[in-house]
Amino acid sequence: MKVLFAGGGTGGHLYPAIAMAAELQRLSPNVSVAFVGTKSGIEATEVPRLGYKLHLVSVRGLKRGFSPKLLIENLRILFDFARSLGITIQLLRSEAPDVVVGTGGFVSAPLLFAAQLLGKKTLIQEQNAFPGVTTRLLSLFASEVHVAFNEARRFLLNKRHVFLTGNPARLFQPMDAAQARARFGLQHNRPTLLVFGGSRGARSLNNAIASQLDTLLASVNLIWQTGSLDGEKLKAEVKPSPYLWMAPYIEDMEAAYSAADVVVCRAGASSLAELTNLGKVALLVPYPYATADHQRHNAQSLVEHGAALMVADSEAFTKLVPTALELLQNSGKRAAMSVAAAKQAHPDAAGVLAKRVLGLSR
């Protein structure tokens, strides 16, 4: 059996595919797995590093907006898409996969479209509450579409063969909170706030925390992942404190999650899957420039289920710290939110998806 995956550009699209591929080979060691990607995406280095075969195609996403310059650029992009479609048709004929899986990003569009033209079984895994253009268009003819948020269904024209499966994500084993705090050199009996914003960091989160750091540290521990963008600057400006751990990157996320009573972060699909799998209480600040504002849709889904609170990026400077402190001081509200978050969890998402792929091949 052969399975071809397409999804990349960013880790948010690639890592669900990698999790599914690993689970497929665990369930059925004879399955042959390969990936399709671009040389500019994260998949160009990550897929070979993990030992998977990678086929490269040249394709780019359409530019949003309207101007003569953008029109010309989009015409070039459409020409590249047509050329990549021809290449992927040849690839599908030579590789002859039993199932083609798309996990989003513009790289998945030509492969899924070509597979549908050739009558191949296709499975789409959509990570966000607001589906991308590729999912919305190609879901019409997909064998199965798997969504991570039930709200995504209403944006799909063909609602048959749509399943709520969740997002494959890293699974962490919860540890004792006091022991986890000790790993960061923090007091075991203080409420603890975890703030992170991705590898580069989130400037609006950093600015909000820095502006009211003394207020925070007066009553709570803070684990603060600053990211590479502001890391050195903040390190030079912030005074050491026994209640503060800060660094550009957190190596031990399992301990960081376990130490935290409240987590402040963006609303990317992978982060939300990790949070709900652990039943963590979250204060979400959606990235305002995400495509089609999909992070806001993701956050809104959890808010509507009572599983998170949300602060707009534009209001983070004034509202983030007061909201976080209020939540840290309200144990009853945190307990209810934790239960609600756990109800949105899909810790077995990778396994369920792998079994669906195997089922399509039969």
Swiss-Prot record:
One of its GO terms (molecular function) is undecaprenyldiphospho-muramoylpentapeptide beta-N-acetylglucosaminyltransferase activity. GO terms for biological process: carbohydrate metabolic process; cell division; cell wall organization; lipid glycosylation; peptidoglycan biosynthetic process; regulation of cell shape. Its EC number is 2.4.1.227. The keyword Transferase applies. Keywords: Cell cycle, Cell division, Cell inner membrane, Cell membrane, Cell shape, Cell wall biogenesis/degradation, Glycosyltransferase, Membrane, Peptidoglycan synthesis, Transferase. It is a peripheral membrane protein. InterPro entries: GlcNAc_MurG, Glyco_trans_28_C, GlycoTrans_28_N. GO terms for cellular component: plasma membrane. UDP-N-acetyl-alpha-D-glucosamine binds at T10, G11, G12, N128, R170, S199, I250, Q295. The keyword Membrane applies. Pathway: Cell wall biogenesis; peptidoglycan biosynthesis. It is found in: Cell inner membrane. Gene3D superfamilies: Glycogen Phosphorylase B. It catalyses: di-trans,octa-cis-undecaprenyl diphospho-N-acetyl-alpha-D-muramoyl-L-alanyl-D-glutamyl-meso-2,6-diaminopimeloyl-D-alanyl-D-alanine + UDP-N-acetyl-alpha-D-glucosamine = di-trans,octa-cis-undecaprenyl diphospho-[N-acetyl-alpha-D-glucosaminyl-(1->4)]-N-acetyl-alpha-D-muramoyl-L-alanyl-D-glutamyl-meso-2,6-diaminopimeloyl-D-alanyl-D-alanine + UDP + H(+). It holds the Pfam family Glyco_transf_28. NCBIfam families: murG. Belongs to the glycosyltransferase 28 family. MurG subfamily. Cell wall formation. Catalyzes the transfer of a GlcNAc subunit on undecaprenyl-pyrophosphoryl-MurNAc-pentapeptide (lipid intermediate I) to form undecaprenyl-pyrophosphoryl-MurNAc-(pentapeptide)GlcNAc (lipid intermediate II). HAMAP family: MurG (MF_00033). This is UDP-N-acetylglucosamine--N-acetylmuramyl-(pentapeptide) pyrophosphoryl-undecaprenol N-acetylglucosamine transferase. It comes from Chlorobium chlorochromatii (strain CaD3). The lineage of its organism: Bacteria, Pseudomonadati, Chlorobiota, Chlorobiia, Chlorobiales. The gene is murG.
